[in-house]
């Protein structure tokens, strides 16, 4: 009973144990809030149990409360001892923490300006809330910004993005040792540690210099050998003769020529009224001069090359006629045969390059245009080969740039219209056309027209450039001019028909396309008797005619369109 005490000694103001408990538990709101439910349940249980106390128990409790003379237990010595123990524990730890924190900031500049992360002891935490309120709004704002301290500790970021010094075990062990030292010993140890680290860095630097010295000599030797090898290669390139440059160019040209479709041998028409005529070539020339159908002139030239397979001019004219007659494959096969017999034929080279562009074989076209420059302007080509004998590894853009520069140099030789080379302007226009630089293409083709205004081919090329440049009205004018100069120019009619379709003028498109197909007919030969090769060559015209009928909503006429069809059925509806 004496251990419990009695009377007023149980009050908090006079009970030393109660005062000690208040002192060490200044702010326990966080812990209490976590146990709030349990605390309330305990009170409820106490209130329920109070009504069940027996009369005997109540009498004993009254007797206990009436004891006034029993001395209370003296807690003053215990409180004094506890205070001494607490001060002895906190003071060295705080000194050690402050000393290590200051030393660490001096060693690491990344945390030199960081806020101190001090350990809060029970004594410090007693007045923390009061100190925080007195610190002012700046400190409170700073604390609010660090609600997620793991993202704002400089040491953590350095470990992730920097050298990771806080991740090493030696630093942690050193901190543990300094907690056991007094401030003077910590300072002495720090000075010794700093001197030792400086000496270690000096030794390490000296060893690294010794290790890197052989590498430096080896690198100098390797660099010298590389420079010497480069000199030898450059000297070998300079020693190449013009014949060797020519051989290299021929090799590259063959490479690009092999990259396009192999058109094979020329396929002749089975029915040809000129086959046994000894003057087939002259007949073909007269037909072209008189404005006859290109198909008839083509048959005459076919007969000429069949009679004399080495007739270069006949192969050239056959190729030109077939390309103008919208028979690209036959035209390319004839032109390639012409160049096989005469590799320097300028007309064949230019026409073949344009045909390659039409069929999408750009690199083959560039190589052919370079051959054209090499033939007509050998000085320009020779200087270009000396600086770069390759055709630049098949890169389409670089190859176009290289050949364009050659043609630009050739154009600079005769800037005046009176002395201008129309073929140079045509070649430049083709190069720009392949890169879809249609504004430059138009300028080049217009320049060629200034030199040769009566050449239907120039007007047709200008029309194609204008159409691709989204100028259909001007394109129609150019195509119309080409047809005025050569009414049997099938390609110009085909292009004109396409332009009318794009403009929504379907009836006019149909009439020009039907005219083009009719120009493929040969007098005395039924369309159904034409060879399969002839029918395939009409395919572009036929398919475009179907599109025009669909635009007119004449599906009844679409089924009547096929290669070798009779054209009489359309003459009552269309003027051609």
From Swiss-Prot:
Membrane topology per record: Peripheral membrane protein
Gene3D superfamilies: Tetratricopeptide repeat domain
Post-translational modifications reported in the UniProt record: A disulfide bond is created between Cys-10 and Cys-338 or Cys-444.
Record-listed cross-link Glycyl lysine isopeptide (Lys-Gly) (interchain with G-Cter in ubiquitin), residues: 22
Motif window: WxxxF/Y motif 1: 100-104
GO cellular component, one term: peroxisomal membrane
Subcellular location: Peroxisome membrane; Cytoplasm, Cytosol; Peroxisome matrix
Motif (WxxxF/Y motif 4): 249-253
Motif (WxxxF/Y motif 2): 128-132
Keyword tags: Cytoplasm, Disulfide bond, Isopeptide bond, Membrane, Peroxisome, Protein transport, Repeat, Thioester bond, TPR repeat, Translocation, Transport, Ubl conjugation
Gene Ontology biological process terms from the UniProt entry: protein import into peroxisome matrix, docking
Effect of residue 338 to S: Completely abolishes the formation of internal disulfide bond and leads to defects in importing peroxisomal PTS1 cargo
Role: Receptor that mediates peroxisomal import of proteins containing a C-terminal PTS1-type tripeptide peroxisomal targeting signal (SKL-type). Binds to cargo proteins containing a PTS1 peroxisomal targeting signal in the cytosol, and translocates them into the peroxisome matrix by passing through the peroxisomal docking complex along with cargo proteins. PEX5 receptor is then retrotranslocated into the cytosol, leading to release of bound cargo in the peroxisome matrix, and reset for a subsequent peroxisome import cycle. Required for PEX7 ubiquitination.
Domain notes: The TPR repeats mediate interaction with proteins containing a C-terminal PTS1-type tripeptide peroxisomal targeting signal (SKL-type). The WxxxF/Y motifs mediate interaction with PEX14, promoting association with the PEX13-PEX14 docking complex.
Family to which the UniProt record says this protein belongs: Belongs to the peroxisomal targeting signal receptor family.
Assembly and interaction partners: Interacts (via WxxxF/Y and LVxEF motifs) with PEX14; promoting translocation through the PEX13-PEX14 docking complex. Interacts with PEX8.
Name recorded for this polypeptide: Peroxisomal targeting signal receptor
Organism of origin: Komagataella phaffii (strain GS115 / ATCC 20864)
Higher taxonomy: Eukaryota, Fungi, Dikarya, Ascomycota, Saccharomycotina
């Amino acid at each position: 009973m004496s251990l419990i005490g009695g009377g007023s000694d149980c009050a908090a103001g006079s009970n030393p144990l109660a005062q000690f408990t208040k002192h060490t538990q200044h702010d326990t709101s966080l812990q209490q809030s976590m146990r709030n439910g349990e605390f309330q349940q305990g009170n409820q249980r106490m209130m329920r149990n109070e009504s069940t106390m027996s009369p005997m128990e109540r009498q004993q409790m009254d007797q206990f409360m009436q004891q006034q003379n029993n001395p209370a237990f003296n807690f003053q010595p215990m409180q004094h001892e506890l205070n001494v123990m607490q001060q002895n524990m906190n003071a060295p730890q705080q000194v050690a923490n402050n000393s290590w924190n200051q030393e660490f900031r001096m060693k690491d500049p990344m945390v030199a300006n960081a806020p101190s992360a001090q350990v809060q002891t029970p004594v410090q935490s007693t007045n923390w809330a009061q100190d925080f309120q007195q610190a002012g709004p700046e400190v409170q704002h700073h604390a609010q910004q660090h609600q997620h301290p793991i993202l704002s500790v400089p040491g953590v970021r350095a470990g992730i993005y920097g050298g990771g010094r806080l991740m090493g075990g030696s630093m942690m062990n050193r901190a543990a040792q300094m907690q056991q030292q007094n401030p003077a010993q910590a300072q002495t140890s720090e000075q010794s540690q700093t001197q030792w680290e400086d000496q270690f860095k000096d030794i390490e630097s000296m060893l690294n210099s010794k290790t890197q010295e052989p590498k430096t000599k080896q690198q100098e030797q390797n660099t010298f050998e590389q420079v010497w090898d480069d000199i030898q290669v450059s000297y070998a390139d300079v020693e190449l003769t013009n014949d060797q440059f020519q051989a290299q160019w021929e090799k590259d040209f063959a490479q690009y020529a092999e990259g396009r479709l192999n058109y094979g041998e020329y396929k002749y028409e089975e029915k040809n009224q000129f086959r046994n005529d000894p003057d087939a070539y002259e007949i073909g020339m007269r037909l072209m001069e008189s404005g006859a159908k290109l198909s008839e002139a083509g048959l005459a030239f076919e007969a000429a090359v069949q009679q004399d397979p080495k007739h270069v001019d006949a192969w050239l004219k056959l190729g030109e006629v077939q390309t103008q007659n919208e028979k690209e494959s036959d035209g390319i096969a004839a032109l390639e045969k012409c160049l096989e017999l005469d590799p320097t034929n300028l007309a064949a080279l230019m026409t073949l390059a344009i045909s390659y562009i039409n069929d999408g074989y750009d690199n083959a076209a560039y190589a052919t245009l370079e051959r054209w420059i090499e033939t007509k302007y050998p000085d320009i080509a020779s200087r270009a080969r000396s600086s770069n004998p390759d055709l630049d590894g098949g890169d389409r853009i670089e190859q176009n740039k290289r050949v364009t520069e050659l043609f630009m140099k050739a154009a600079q030789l005769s800037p005046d219209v009176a002395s201008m080379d129309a073929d140079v302007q045509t070649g430049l226009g083709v190069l720009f056309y392949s890169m879809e630089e249609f504004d430059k293409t138009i300028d080049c083709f217009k320049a060629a027209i200034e030199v040769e205004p009566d050449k239907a081919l120039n007007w047709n090329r200008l029309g194609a450039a204008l159409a691709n440049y989204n100028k259909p009205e001007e394109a129609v004018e150019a195509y119309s001019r080409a047809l005025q100069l050569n009414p049997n120019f099938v390609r110009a009619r085909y292009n004109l028909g396409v332009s009318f379709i794009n403009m929504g003028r379907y009836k006019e498109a149909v009439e020009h396309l039907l005219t083009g197909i009719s120009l493929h007919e040969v007098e005395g030969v039924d369309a159904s008797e034409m060879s399969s090769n002839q029918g395939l060559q009409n395919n572009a015209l036929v398919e475009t005619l179907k599109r025009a009928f669909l635009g007119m909503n004449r599906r009844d006429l679409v089924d009547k369109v096929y290669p070798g069809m009779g054209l009489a059925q359309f003459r009552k509806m269309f003027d051609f």
